[in-house]
């Protein structure tokens, strides 16, 4: 196998037993593809599909005027180039967007002859701004990165369910059906406890369902014919004859003697009719059975019976037969009658009963009844009734099932799936009611609403399209009204279309929708997980309060589609999920997962993606099934899932149709990063997966020694590590940029064959963590497309590195690791292992106030020179300044209103003039509890305001950097051109040239080297073709120079034009502080198995427990944290990490002894190729083997993939290889090499029992004590109660609550209690007096009335109770 540029630097030894046929798909594909399909920006207008923006335009246009004389048609749209790039938008607080322009055609017909077109006006109209997605799947809205989370909602279609017996006290199941469109009114059908079937529209008042059936044109006779089979009777003078249908009689109790045609009694009265009786009647050729008169009574007629002579209706359909009715029938000479066949078991009389409840006479009355239900109180005119009924379910404007909905309706109603209109059909309603009645009759199954075949994902593109369509429909209303005036006032399309409704709908969605979230940017994993999140909440989804247990639970169809582990703890559990590693969306928005095809028990290389519904038809085996070298399933029985319930059963191999593509298919990206996940309890695995997202990037990232092999995929797909867009040779590298000269075969003709990667340096993330990229390549390195050329935050050699590898000992230590506390060695802090950099953004704005403009200046009165020392002449701090809490970062003064002057101020004014008193100092200072180094300053100035020197110097620096990029591109372009020229000119005959070159002379390399390259163009070749080529190269270079000059000019214009600032703001300054946070007691740490704790103490290195060879442990964890939590994965990780460290030390020792590559190869082969996946070490050169070995000195990285990881015997083998007996003895290892005899650092004595010691990857989480630590002396008070505010953000105090008061009462500390309740809280006069007393040096307290008592008195008075306090 071929290794990439970075992979061969440090190969991760994998223990995977199964080769992967299907690579993990690009992790951000769902987001990026969805939005690309929405915009279709790159697709030519003629070839655009009807989706996204195109679909929205097609749905609204054409718009016709009310009189039909004018109409506006949509032609096409295009998106302009964004005015600012992503970085500029973030700096300036703008939205990264593109202007949408649509070409529309206004057609005006002739008034006299409406069929004739009078004039056509075509124009491009501005339709608002559409935010663009960045290359990593996020959006920049008002300068901050946001993510649109996908929504999991109930799919449009038809669903059948029952209430599980909860509605009625008897526990009777009440069945219901619901037709849910994508857009439009919901239609519900439901049985009540009396078995009458009702319908509702949009959850309004219920009405008998037969009203709906009558309104679509059915008569009572037709309704009964649809829902019942009939019994045929021939009336006789006494009794009747029943047409014999065998199946209808079985199981019934005979109410009379039943005889065959020969008169032989086959079934006696009151006997139950069984199969033998039926056979006897059948064999006797019985066609008719004589029944007595009372057998007819109570039966229900199926059809209207009309007197053949008079045409009079004798009996109506659905009438019960009574003696009177029978008598009338006989009198009229009616012989044949049909009645409804019903029974108690599987043919209930539900529709017949419903018809009796229904009081409407015909179609018109039914529609009026529906109108009254929808519009109570409005008079039902014929047109209004008809219009409302059509609009409810039959109008494409107001009702849309969508392709998904039509497909789901058709498949549930057992029709061919793709066909049908997007509105409801009469047959849809009829079929739905039939299925519902059948369910009540005990036939068929209800739907499972939590099945992923009934829930679909709405992605960014679809959500944005819905918003855009909503905005466009508002525009449509306005255009409709104005179209009538288009002809008379000679209006153009842009006069009719106002883009504001579209812009505001889009802005509202991206800015404040529940699904538009502030991106979690703590580390690369949190970014990628946030973009792969699927939420059941949001508009059109569930709410936390109403979501029950079933919706939140793991469902069998989640397998391979949604992760069963990763979900938040708390009220959102189960409502917010993560996509599984291999999951993707199909065209309908349903989640699919890949399976490998199995034919005749043999695995093929064909991989098919199946949705939850499709999967139900197949038998799917698990990835851990035993397979031989040829790919045959060898076990007699294989564990597989089959049936719609997806129950796991043991099946024979020949029945298997598909097999999982990979064991990690079930879990999400975060869960698949947990090694030995299969050995962890699910609850702890959930915490482990969630806490990895909170890991703070460390100053020096350290790859996990025990990983799962997915680390590289996550790092690269998140966009944190920089990938080469095209292959080539590294031409230039510094900390800020990498320049790559692109390979000739990958460069596009006519374009610059240079790729420049400007690295992100010390940039603030949304969570204030530091994003910094470091180059990994050297000049001259050859890289291929997709190779990692620079590491980002939390990545190490292109692999995700969230924490640090720590030497962990599991043992108690003086109670300092009680209850999950963590003991840390001082060495960890000294080596900056967990030091992280956090970047704080502090900003100040200078506004134009009523009293005059605020000014950013260094000239501030009442400030000592020492406080201004860090400010430059413009009043802004310089980069590199070390600042602490209270230091001035930006000097600012605000004009003050004229006030009564004190004598002191009058004196100052007399001495210093006006300035001293009429402004107040409102400078930007470093907030309390913060200190750091200024790393960047941004100055934004309003258009028309003169820039200060600092702002100008920032612009000059930016232009200088840009010019550098252009110069590099030009240098490489010219270099290539001159190389081609040299090859072209050498040995060519010339007519003359510089330095008196003689005619007829041949050009030599030496001659060309002597003259300046630009003078080569002055050479006059004898060959005309060569001369033409020379001229062409000269023109090409000049053209490129011209292009670069234009680009530079455009950049200068962009930087020098005024900035867009909020109204009233003249100038804004942003100062970025880098704060260094070392690990300290109170910081939260965690492993990857849900084993979290708080640092309790940092112990001097000499006091830590140490091994026999003197190596001290880095961290001491409590062994009691493992058994009850059942996350044994951490112990296995510790053992394997211990082996990894040992192998690294062995390789390091060999390198110290100057071992050659050939000596290293046998050990490397033992490590990599004795178990698990084999590595192709022979393909590496000796230099590459030495580089690999150098990178392995700190430990050989292992990959133990989820559910396919290292077994115990493999861990033992690695431990034996890492610690041969001589080394093991020296370190004090036990025979198993999994435990060590440790010594107490303080006494030097060995501990009584051996201790589990090894290497674990530990993370420092974002809950840092520095962010929580807070102290207040005096500060702000609440306005009403006058009590101190709460919380760090408000600079609040600590609440002394009810229970704390009890504690002081219990101690009898009455004076302390009094001051707590008065002067330290809300006794306003008392606390002022205390301050005065302290200043005077008196230590006495006069406690007064707490303000909260006055509030209580006022509140009681507000209830009309006169309460007053008698003061004695």
Swiss-Prot record:
Pfam families: RNA_pol_Rpb2_1, RNA_pol_Rpb2_2, RNA_pol_Rpb2_3, RNA_pol_Rpb2_45, RNA_pol_Rpb2_6, RNA_pol_Rpb2_7. GO terms for molecular function: DNA binding; DNA-directed RNA polymerase activity; ribonucleoside binding. Its EC number is 2.7.7.6. Gene3D superfamilies: 2.40.50.100, 2.40.50.150, 3.90.1100.10, DNA-directed RNA polymerase, beta subunit, external 1 domain (2.30.150.10), DNA-directed RNA polymerase, subunit 2, domain 6 (2.40.270.10), RNA polymerase alpha subunit dimerisation domain (3.90.1800.10), RNA polymerase Rpb2, domain 2 (3.90.1110.10). GO terms for cellular component: DNA-directed RNA polymerase complex. Keywords: DNA-directed RNA polymerase, Nucleotidyltransferase, Transcription, Transferase. One of its GO terms (biological process) is DNA-templated transcription. It catalyses: RNA(n) + a ribonucleoside 5'-triphosphate = RNA(n+1) + diphosphate. Belongs to the RNA polymerase beta chain family. PANTHER family: DNA-DIRECTED RNA POLYMERASE I SUBUNIT 2 (PTHR20856). DNA-dependent RNA polymerase catalyzes the transcription of DNA into RNA using the four ribonucleoside triphosphates as substrates. The RNAP catalytic core consists of 2 alpha, 1 beta, 1 beta' and 1 omega subunit. When a sigma factor is associated with the core the holoenzyme is formed, which can initiate transcription. HAMAP family: RNApol_bact_RpoB. This is DNA-directed RNA polymerase subunit beta. It comes from Cupriavidus pinatubonensis (strain JMP 134 / LMG 1197).
């Amino acid at each position: 196998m071929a290794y990439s540029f970075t992979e061969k630097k440090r190969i991760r030894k994998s223990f995977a037993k199964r080769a992967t046929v299907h690579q993990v798909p690009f992790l951000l594909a769902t987001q990026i593809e969805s939005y690309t399909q929405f915009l279709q920006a790159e697709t030519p207008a003629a070839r655009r599909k009807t989706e996204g923006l195109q679909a929205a335009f097609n749905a609204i246009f054409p718009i016709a005027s009310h009189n039909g004389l004018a109409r506006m048609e949509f032609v096409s749209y295009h998106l302009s180039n964004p005015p600012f790039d992503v970085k500029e938008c973030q700096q300036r607080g703008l939205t990264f967007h593109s202007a949408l322009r649509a070409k529309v055609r206004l057609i005006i017909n002739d008034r006299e002859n409406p069929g004739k077109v009078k004039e056509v006006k075509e124009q491009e109209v501005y339709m608002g701004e559409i935010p663009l997605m960045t290359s990593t799947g996020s959006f920049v809205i008002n300068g901050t990165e946001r993510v649109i989370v996908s929504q999991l909602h109930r799919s449009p279609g038809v669903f059948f369910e029952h209430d599980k017996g909860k509605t009625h006290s008897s526990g009777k199941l009440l069945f219901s059906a619901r037709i849910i469109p994508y857009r439009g009114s919901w239609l519900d059908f439901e049985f009540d406890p009396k078995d009458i079937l009702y319908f509702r529209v949009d959850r309004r008042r219920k009405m008998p369902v037969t009203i709906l059936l009558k309104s679509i044109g059915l008569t009572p006779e037709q309704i009964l014919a649809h829902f019942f089979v009939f019994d045929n009777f021939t009336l006789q003078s006494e009794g009747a004859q029943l047409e014999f249908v065998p199946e209808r009689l079985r199981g019934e109790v005979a109410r009379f003697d039943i005889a065959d045609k020969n008169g032989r009694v086959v079934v006696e009265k009151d006997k139950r009719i069984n199969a033998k009786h039926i056979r006897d009647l059948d064999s006797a050729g019985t066609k008719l059975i004589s029944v007595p008169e009372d057998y007819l009574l109570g039966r229900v007629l199926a059809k209207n019976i009309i007197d053949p002579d008079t045409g009079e209706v004798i009996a109506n359909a659905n009438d019960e037969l009574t003696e009177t009715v029978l008598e009338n029938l006989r009198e009229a000479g009616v012989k044949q009658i049909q009645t409804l066949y019903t029974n108690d078991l599987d043919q209930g009389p539900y529709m017949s009963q419903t018809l009796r409840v229904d009081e409407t006479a015909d179609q018109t009355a039914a529609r009026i009844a529906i109108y009254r239900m929808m519009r109570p109180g409005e008079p039902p005119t014929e047109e209004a009734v008809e219009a409302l009924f059509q609009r409810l379910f039959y109008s494409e404007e107001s009702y849309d099932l969508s392709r998904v909905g039509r497909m789901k309706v058709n498949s549930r109603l057992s029709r061919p799936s793709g066909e049908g209109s997007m509105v409801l059909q009469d047959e849809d309603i009829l079929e739905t009611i039939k299925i519902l009645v059948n369910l009540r009759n005990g036939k068929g199954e209800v739907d499972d609403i939590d099945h992923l075949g009934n829930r679909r994902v709405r992605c960014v593109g679809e959500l944005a399209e819905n918003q855009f369509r909503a905005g466009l429909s508002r525009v449509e209303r306005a255009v409709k009204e104005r179209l009538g005036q288009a002809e008379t006032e000679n209006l153009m399309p842009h006069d009719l279309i106002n883009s504001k409704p579209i812009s505001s709908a889009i802005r509202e969605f991206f800015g404040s929708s529940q699904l538009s979230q502030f991106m979690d940017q703590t580390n690369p994993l949190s970014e990628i997980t946030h973009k792969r999140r699927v939420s059941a909440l949001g508009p059109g989804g569930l709410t936390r309060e109403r979501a029950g247990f079933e919706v939140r639970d793991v469902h069998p169809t989640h397998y391979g589609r949604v992760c069963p582990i990763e979900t938040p703890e708390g009220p959102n559990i189960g409502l917010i999920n993560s996509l599984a590693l291999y999951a993707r969306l199909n065209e309908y928005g349903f989640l699919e997962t890949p399976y490998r095809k199995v034919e005749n028990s043999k695995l093929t290389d064909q991989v098919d993606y199946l949705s939850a519904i499709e999967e139900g038809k197949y038998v799917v085996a698990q990835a851990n099934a035993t397979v031989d070298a040829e790919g045959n399933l060898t076990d007699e029985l294989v564990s597989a899932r089959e049936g719609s319930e997806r129950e796991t059963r043991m099946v024979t191999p020949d029945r298997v149709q598909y097999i999982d593509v990979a064991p990690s298919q079930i879990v999400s990206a975060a869960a698949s990063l947990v090694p030995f996940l299969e050995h962890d309890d699910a609850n702890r695995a959930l915490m482990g997966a969630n806490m990895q997202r909170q890991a703070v990037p460390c100053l020096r990232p350290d790859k996990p020694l025990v990983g799962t092999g997915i680390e590289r995929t996550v790092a690269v797909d998140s966009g944190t590590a920089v990938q080469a867009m095209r292959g080539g040779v590294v031409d230039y590298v510094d900390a800020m940029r990498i320049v790559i000269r692109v390979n000739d075969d990958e460069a596009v003709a006519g374009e610059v064959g240079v790729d420049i990667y400007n690295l992100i340096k010390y940039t603030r993330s949304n969570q204030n963590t530091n994003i910094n990229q470091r180059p990994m390549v050297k000049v001259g390195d050859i890289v291929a497309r997709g190779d990692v050329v620079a590491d980002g935050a939390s990545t190490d050699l292109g692999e995700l590195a969230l924490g640090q590898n720590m030497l962990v000992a599991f043992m108690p230590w003086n109670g300092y690791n009680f209850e999950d506390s963590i003991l840390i060695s001082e060495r960890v802090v000294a080596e900056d292992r967990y030091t992280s950099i956090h970047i704080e953004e502090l900003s100040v704005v200078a506004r134009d106030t009523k009293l005059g403009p605020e000014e950013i200046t260094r000239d501030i009165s009442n400030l000592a020179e020492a406080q201004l020392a860090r400010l430059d002449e413009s009043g802004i701090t310089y980069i590199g300044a070390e600042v602490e809490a209270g230091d001035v970062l930006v000097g600012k003064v605000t004009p003050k209103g004229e006030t009564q002057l004190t004598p002191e101020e009058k004196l100052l004014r007399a001495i210093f003039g006006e300035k001293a008193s009429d402004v107040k100092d409102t400078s930007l200072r470093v907030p309390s509890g913060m200190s750091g180094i200024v790393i960047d300053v941004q100055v934004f100035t309003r258009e028309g305001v003169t820039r200060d020197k600092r702002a100008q110097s920032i612009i000059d620096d930016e232009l200088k950097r840009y010019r550098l990029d252009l110069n590099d591109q030009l240098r490489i372009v010219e270099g290539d051109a001159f190389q081609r020229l040299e090859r072209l000119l050498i040995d060519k005959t010339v007519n003359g040239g510089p330095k008196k070159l003689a005619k007829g002379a041949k050009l030599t390399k030496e001659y060309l080297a002597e003259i300046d390259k630009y003078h080569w163009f002055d050479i006059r070749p004898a060959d005309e073709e060569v001369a033409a080529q020379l001229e062409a190269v000269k023109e090409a270079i000049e053209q490129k120079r011209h292009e670069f000059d234009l680009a530079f000019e455009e950049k200068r214009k962009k930087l020098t034009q005024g900035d867009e600032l909020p109204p009233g703001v003249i100038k804004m300054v942003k100062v970025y502080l880098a704060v260094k946070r070392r690990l300290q007691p109170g910081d939260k740490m965690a492993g990857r198995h849900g084993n979290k704790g708080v640092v309790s103490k940092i112990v001097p290195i000499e006091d830590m427990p140490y091994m026999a060879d003197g190596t001290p442990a880095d961290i001491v964890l409590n062994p009691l944290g493992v058994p009850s939590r059942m996350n044994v994965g951490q112990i296995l990780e510790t053992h394997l990490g211990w082996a990894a460290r040992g192998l690294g030390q062995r390789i390091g020792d060999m390198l110290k002894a100057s071992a050659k590559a050939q000596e290293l190869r046998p050990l490397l082969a033992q490590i990599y190729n004795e178990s698990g996946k084999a590595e192709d070490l022979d393909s590496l050169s000796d230099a590459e083997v030495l580089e690999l070995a150098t990178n392995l000195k700190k430990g050989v990285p292992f990959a133990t993939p989820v559910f396919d990881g290292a077994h115990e015997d493999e861990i033992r083998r690695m431990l034996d290889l890492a610690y041969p007996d001589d080394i093991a003895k020296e370190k004090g290892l036990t025979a198993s090499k999994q435990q060590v005899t440790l010594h107490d650092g303080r006494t030097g004595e060995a501990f009584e029992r051996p201790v589990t010691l090894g290497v674990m990857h530990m993370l420092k989480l974002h809950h840092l004590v520095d962010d929580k630590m807070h102290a207040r002396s005096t500060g702000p008070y609440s306005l009403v109660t006058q009590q101190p505010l709460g919380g760090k953000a408000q600079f609040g105090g600590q609440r002394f609550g009810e229970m704390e008061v009890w504690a002081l009462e219990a101690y009898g500390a009455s004076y302390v209690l009094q001051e707590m309740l008065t002067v330290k809280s809300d006794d306003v006069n008392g606390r002022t007096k205390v301050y005065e007393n302290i200043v005077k040096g008196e230590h006495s307290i006069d406690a007064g009335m707490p303000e909260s008592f006055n509030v209580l008195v006022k509140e009681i008075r507000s209830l009309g109770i006169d309460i007053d306090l008698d003061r004695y």
